[in-house]
Amino acid sequence: MGKRKANHTISGMNAASAQGQGTGYNEEFANEPFTPAERQNNKKRKKNQ
């Protein structure tokens, strides 16, 4: 049968991106300021996490 490889990683791709860590995406949007509505929502969600 050969060696079993983890099914969620795609060979030839960046391992991190294959596991849902879209690095570029996160870095791009991480520092964008919230609108007042988003800021309000963010506070509530933080408590629940």
From Swiss-Prot:
Record keywords, A-Z: Sporulation
Region (Disordered), start-end ranges: 1-49
Keyword Metal-binding: no
Compositionally skewed regions (Polar residues) per UniProt: 8-20
Compartment annotation: Spore core
Induction, per UniProt: Expressed only in the forespore compartment of sporulating cells.
Keyword Oxidoreductase: no
Gene Ontology annotations of biological process type: asexual sporulation; sporulation resulting in formation of a cellular spore
Short name of one Pfam family: SspO
One GO CC term on file: endospore-forming forespore
InterPro entries listed in its UniProt record: SASP_SspO
Stated family: Belongs to the SspO family.
Name used for this protein in its record: Small, acid-soluble spore protein O
Species this chain originates from: Bacillus cereus (strain ATCC 14579 / DSM 31 / CCUG 7414 / JCM 2152 / NBRC 15305 / NCIMB 9373 / NCTC 2599 / NRRL B-3711)
